[in-house]
């Protein structure tokens, strides 16, 4: 279910990325800090690159267990080697060993300082994994961050919100739409969707404000103006 094109981007794209987020730390705490045996007392970047190249060679040959071993050696030699963390995470993900991929993705995210496609892929994938496991307290941080990072991806917003709402986590669904409105303010359907959940939670006045916002963004739409009037009549 999780094997999407997003995952392939984790392996293929460059490693420069953005700021740390609290969710990554919580994943590391839950799944452990990926304690790897160190081969020496100091970081050896050159050795790390050597193991990384060997891991990539094995991965290209689809000798994944050998690739895993080399990537782990690379991380042991240089714990901040983002390429090795990302590629090892991607390998575990491909093999559907998701619990082993999670802390690696979290470590990769924490190392990043700029926004790139690799970071977007890592944050989005980790949010999907946590959401898929029902770890909503952890997934919400990644999901909100993914919306910030990928401001053109409106489809992921509805997937996130519907998952939370269907799981009885309406407040998280509301937070998703609020973040989406902040990042993509011109999308009236986000306001409409937010209003629907607020109505569901019997927050009618808040729902009315959301519908008014949608109507203001689409003044020629009778659908939104009618929604405003029907909601106002309930107060």
What is each of the regions a protein language model found here?
Residues 42, 73-76, 109-110, 114, ...:
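Conserved structural position within tetratricopeptide repeats
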Residues 49, 83, 117-121, 155, ...:
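Start-of-helix register in tetratricopeptide repeats
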Residues 60, 94-95, 128, 132, ...:
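Register position in tetratricopeptide repeats
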């Amino acid at each position: 279910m999780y094997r999407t094109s997003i995952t392939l981007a984790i392996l293929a794209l460059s490693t420069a990325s953005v700021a740390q987020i609290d969710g990554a730390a919580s994943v590391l705490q839950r799944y452990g800090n990926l304690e790897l045996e160190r081969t020496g007392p100091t970081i050896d970047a050159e050795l790390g690159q050597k193991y990384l190249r060997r891991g990539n060679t094995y991965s290209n040959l689809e000798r994944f267990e050998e690739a895993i071993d080399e990537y782990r050696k690379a991380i042991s030699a240089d714990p901040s080697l983002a390429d090795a963390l990302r590629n090892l995470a991607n390998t575990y993900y491909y093999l559907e060993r998701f619990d082993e991929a999670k802390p690696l993705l979290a470590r990769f995210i924490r190392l990043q300082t700029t926004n790139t496609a690799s970071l977007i892929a890592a944050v989005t994938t980790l949010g999907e994994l946590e959401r898929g496991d029902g770890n909503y307290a952890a997934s919400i941080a990644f999901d909100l961050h993914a919306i910030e990072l990928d401001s053109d991806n409106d489809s992921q917003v509805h997937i996130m919100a519907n998952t939370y709402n269907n799981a009885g986590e309406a407040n998280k669904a509301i937070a998703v739409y609020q973040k989406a409105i902040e990042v993509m303010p011109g999308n009236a359907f986000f306001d409409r969707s937010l209003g629907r959940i607020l109505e569901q939670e019997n927050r009618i006045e808040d729902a009315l404000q959301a519908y008014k916002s949608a109507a203001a963004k689409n003044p020629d739409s009778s659908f939104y103006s009618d929604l405003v009037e029907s909601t106002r009549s309930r107060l």
